[in-house]
Amino acid sequence: MDRARLWLGLLLPVVAALDFRYHHQEGMEAFLKSVAQNYSSITHLHSIGKSVRGRNLWVLVVGQTPKEHRVGIPEFKYVANMHGDETVGRELLLHLIDYLVSSYRKDPEITHLIDSTRIHIMPSMNPDGFEAVQKPDCYYSNGRENYNNYDLNRNFPDAFENNNVTKQPETLAIMEWLKTETFVLSANLHGGALVASYPFDNGVQATGTLLSRSLTPDDDVFQHLAYTYASRNPNMTKGDQCKNKRNFPNGIINGYSWYPLQGGMQDYNYIWAQCFEITLELSCCKYPREEKLPLFWNDNKASLIEYIKQVHLGVKGQVFDQSGAPLPNVIVEVQDRKHICPFRTNKLGEYYLLLLPGSYVINVTVPGHDSYLTKLTIPGKSQPFSALKKDFHLPLRWQPDSISVSNPSCPMIPLYKFMPSHSAATKPSLGVFFMTLLYVFFK
């Protein structure tokens, strides 16, 4: 087997190393198409939609079966350049692609990662905004918004407030994309600060303290995810590397306690797509000079790889009926971790739960039938590149009339009336709101 891998590594193509410069749409497309052509066995390039001005929203998939999902292989994604003037993430993802494909069958760790994970990489969600930026600029400049002047990170449905704004083509493309894949883990790459921010970004109630937090039922996992990234970035982990910016202990923060925002993408991923997403602020300067790019790559390379590995935390498996047929649309959740929109199995009966080591009670609920409780322990040292596997075989037979095949949609309206008591979210007072404007303006 090792000898076969060696020969395959020798047969894989060699593409010239990607240079450290900003790649505009034409150059980015040329690079992505070259990778897809030269590494066709492990990559798949496709567009999930178009921007306002008709530019493709490219996604490169890296994996052993890049064109299709395979049972037991979790789906991971990185998205960058949501704000067109925040450019470091865009280039880092191009270099990550270059590193992954060139290391396959050469570096054992990267090979295992690609063989056990389906990795989706979108270097630019806002190509129109990027092309609108005239030159490097550390602060607010043209290009943050899309061509229609919408901030895409305020454009998604919001669970806490009625975010009744016109959904943009780029936003709608992401929303449709989330319906086509069972994404488990994600990160959204930004610039203008140096911190890993985790959900929620919005919240409910009203006490008016800036330092209040809005916590998810999976706050322990989210803090772990954010710290996993920040701790491997030598500058982010210090927490105070940007002048005139807030100090972030250990380089992480709850998004709401930094400043509340409505219609953010990471909350939408978690609530409506059952995908854990954090926001990575990668540079104090939004659009730094090109000569700084190698430094950013060196600072973030280990973090980018280690974060992908976290998709294998916890437990995964399938739910079957008594005949062995997979059951779709079954609620599979940890007892006492109630989500706004319940986590459900996909059409193949699969579920993925990101959990830290420990003992849990898993609640499996089939619509119209009884719930089934199972205790399990996730070991501290699990098998590399694989979550604990636990299938459920239920004593019932699936019938289309009794169990819906399609997942019911969660209401796209404020859900504060239905929020469980675990949420510590608070709305800031008017005075606190103005205190946060400086953060919002320069983010």
From Swiss-Prot:
Cofactor: Zn(2+)
EC number: 3.4.17.12
InterPro entries assigned: CarboxyPept-like_regulatory, CPM_N, Peptidase_M14, Peptidase_M14_domain
Organism superkingdom: Eukaryota
Record membrane topology: Lipid-anchor; GPI-anchor
SUPFAM superfamilies per record: Carboxypeptidase regulatory domain-like, Zn-dependent exopeptidases
Role of this protein: Specifically removes C-terminal basic residues (Arg or Lys) from peptides and proteins. It is believed to play important roles in the control of peptide hormone and growth factor activity at the cell surface, and in the membrane-localized degradation of extracellular proteins.
Family: Belongs to the peptidase M14 family.
Name the record gives this protein: Carboxypeptidase M
Source organism: Mus musculus (Mouse)
